[in-house]
Amino acid sequence: MIDGQTTEPKQKTRIILAPMQGLVDDVMRDLLTRIGGYDECVSEFVRITHTVHSRATWLKYVPEIANGNKTFSGTPCTVQLLGSDADNMAANALEAVRFGADKIDLNFGCPAPTVNRHKGGAILLKEPELIFHIVKTLRERLPAHIPLTAKMRLGYEDKSPALECACAIAEGGACGLTVHARTKAEGYEPPAHWEWIRKIRDSVDIPVTANGDVFSLQDYIGIKTISGCNSVMLGRGAVIRPDLARQIKQYENGGPVKDTDFAEVSKWIRQFFELCLTKEANNKYPIARLKQWLGMMKKTFDPAQTLFDRVRTVKDADEVRRILNAFEHEINV
């Protein structure tokens, strides 16, 4: 990619920020959608077990509900549920809607062993009939105007159930499906099998969103071309390269495509830390989240490694703020 390059206008693609548990919480959603390029984001999953969650619980995980289901930059946010009890998932979905949620997504893709042991996420890909029952139950009980979508992987151990599970989701009544192009067993090991997204897209009559291994504009062009999808979900790539969605929109709009520099990134880092402090005015949460993010970005931005080294052993938020301010000044001199 060349800074300043201009392209012809492309067919519009929806760019969605992925739900990533423990990584893209409401603060990260807020920041990344402020940077721009996103048409929608999806919340971290809200785990559904044997209880019906209170309003306080919904707002803890998806505070966007109280803001008209939008991040503070105005990007729509969808509520994601994870579970296997169709009746209780439906009851919770109805409560979320009662409190203001206007779109529900179902998680059939989480690869976390703890989640899978409790019959949630990707383990359900072993049971297409149960997936169908869950989707059908929620679709029948939710108000007709509330969109119901789902996210899945290609399977648990292998890809053999991929088409059956996708069809179960579509036939159950979902109006959209996101496919992460790996099995649970593959975790996040490359490569993502983008060609399988096309197979699924060709097998169902609902819109399919492509997801997996999009870390650059070139990756985006590749997944869109191979999958044939007009909707792409960004996951880890969105965190590692915070301006990725913005670059994609520049490309799609036919304008100049320009990489960010670390002077701009340093401003986002400081802003992120301040947003974390606003959420929890203590030392633990803001510092842990900052170190997590820097630890991911240092693979792409060399100065992130330098900044990570400076804050790695710091445990006081005021000291971290001082380091961030000094580093930003240093970068911008």
Swiss-Prot record:
Residues where FMN binds: 19-21, 80, 151, 211-213, 235-236
UniProt KW keywords: Flavoprotein, FMN, NADP, Oxidoreductase, RNA-binding, tRNA processing, tRNA-binding
Pfam families: Dus
Catalytic residues identified in the record: 110 (proton donor)
Keyword Oxidoreductase: yes
Enzyme class, broadest EC rank: oxidoreductase
EC nos: 1.3.1.-
Oxidoreductase is among the record's keywords: yes
PANTHER family: TRNA-DIHYDROURIDINE SYNTHASE, TRNA-DIHYDROURIDINE(16) SYNTHASE
UniProt similarity note: Belongs to the Dus family. DusC subfamily.
Annotated protein name in UniProt: tRNA-dihydrouridine(16) synthase
Organism from which the protein derives: Neisseria meningitidis serogroup A / serotype 4A (strain DSM 15465 / Z2491)
